């Protein structure tokens, strides 16, 4: 008689973590009335891209925002240009465009409602919302290393 065939069952899959803590910025900032990526913001986006390359299950929603000092229509378009330039920068860093969605809120979701120069700088931003497509909770840090304050005008 033939010896019995021994089948080794496959190892059970490793359980997914409950939460992933990412040392990853959640926003980048822009100069007054600009949508181009500054050198400092570019460094922030490169840091984000590096983390995203290590975590292929994470997708991103980009939301463009402005300060309140123009018409709502203009600010909607400016917020969208900011979100697009941020997406394009991520794509140039090797992140697949399918992982990124963009939208603009213009001036409708101010980070801070006050009206000094620092508050305006905080409002001129693109926010990153990260989601793990497997449903794992993500813990994210915020940063302001690339705030771009405008120069005070001389009277």
Go through the PLM ranges and name each one.
Residues 1-59, 131-155:
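Periplasmic peptidoglycan-binding/tethering modules of Gram-negative envelope proteins
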């Amino acid at each position: 008689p033939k010896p019995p065939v021994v089948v080794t069952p496959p190892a059970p899959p490793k359980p997914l973590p409950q939460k992933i803590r990412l040392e990853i910025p959640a926003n980048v900032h822009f100069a007054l009335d600009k949508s181009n990526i500054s050198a400092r913001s570019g460094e922030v986006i490169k840091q984000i891209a590096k983390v995203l390359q290590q975590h292929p299950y994470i997708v991103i929603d980009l939301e463009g925002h402005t300060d309140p000092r123009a018409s709502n229509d203009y600010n909607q378009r400016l917020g969208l240009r900011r979100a697009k330039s941020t997406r394009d920068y991520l794509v140039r860093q090797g992140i697949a465009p399918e992982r990124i969605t963009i939208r603009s809120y213009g001036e409708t979701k101010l980070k801070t409602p006050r009206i000094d120069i620092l508050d305006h700088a905080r409002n001129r931003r693109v926010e990153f919302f990260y989601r793990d497509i497997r449903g794992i909770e993500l813990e994210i840090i915020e940063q302001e290393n690339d705030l771009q304050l405008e120069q005070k005008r001389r009277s």
